[in-house]
Amino acid sequence: MNEKNWKEKVFVLLKKFRISNSVLWQIYKPFSRILNFIKHGDLYFFRSVAIEISTSCNRTCYYCPNSLEETPTNFIAQETFNKIIKQLEAIKFSGIVYYHFYNEPLLDKRLPNLIRYVKKHLPSCINRVVSNGDFLSVELADDLISAGVVDFAITIHDLDGEKLLRKLEPVIKKYPGYFMIDSLHGKALSNRGGAIEVETLDKKDTCTDPLELLQFDYKGNVLLCCNDYYRKHPFGNLAHDTLYDIWKGKEFSELRRELRKGIASLEICRICMGKE
């Protein structure tokens, strides 16, 4: 099993006391901002990275654009994945790494080995798997945790989640400090990717999504954020741009400054923030 860094040890310890993800995030935020200012001279440098390792999901939830579109199954090329990680290694990235966009990460059989590669090159990162839990078994959890995962965020999409919870009980019992279970039902919906129309959306005065998380698709494109399902707003590709050049690019930088001030110049942002 990979040796945990100190952040991972603290993360698992706090979760054993059932401290919620939102509280953990609030604890992590100020620390990461100070660290990013020291390392990059930028308080708002991204502290999380999400990599779309495939486009495949086994579910077609009504509130997800996957229910509206027939998406071909594509997998990130190993070369593209390695390039992303190597660029993150070059800037000494030490934040959180996710393995999803609108996909189910556990459908990619390469996931444990991808995480091992990340752990080798980004030893100070926290590896986090966001999943619907449908394919998670004790054996797979063993492999993923051995590879370097310290957190599973399982989202229950069914109205009655008892069946899934019963299925996951042996895994959670074996690794009590590694799981956070959440349900989408009973909460205000966000208009993810523009898939749903509801009378009341969560309204935002400002948006920090593109500031906090850098979203890669399977082709190596850097997208606006996790809501850009249709990939309408790419800001660069690691095939011909460096990570720093993309992040510090004029258009991307100006958009992030505007969003910090509550200015939504793009339609996707106005819809997401409840301004349209």
Language model feature labels by segment:
Residues E3-F152:
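Conserved alpha-helical substructure of the radical SAM core
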Residues C57, C61-C64, C207, C225-C226, ...:
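Short cysteine clusters
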Residues N2-K9, P170-V198, N227-E276:
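C-terminal accessory region of radical SAM enzymes
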Residues Y63, S67-E70, L213, R231-K232, ...:
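Secreted/processed peptides and extracellular or luminal domains of membrane proteins
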Residues I51, T55-N58, L201, I263-L266:
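Processing junctions and N-termini across compartments
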Residues K86, D108-E212, D217:
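Conserved AdoMet/S-adenosylmethionine-binding subsite of the radical SAM
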Residues R47, P210, Y229:
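Exposed loop/turn and edge beta-strand positions of beta-sandwich/beta-sheet ligand-binding modules
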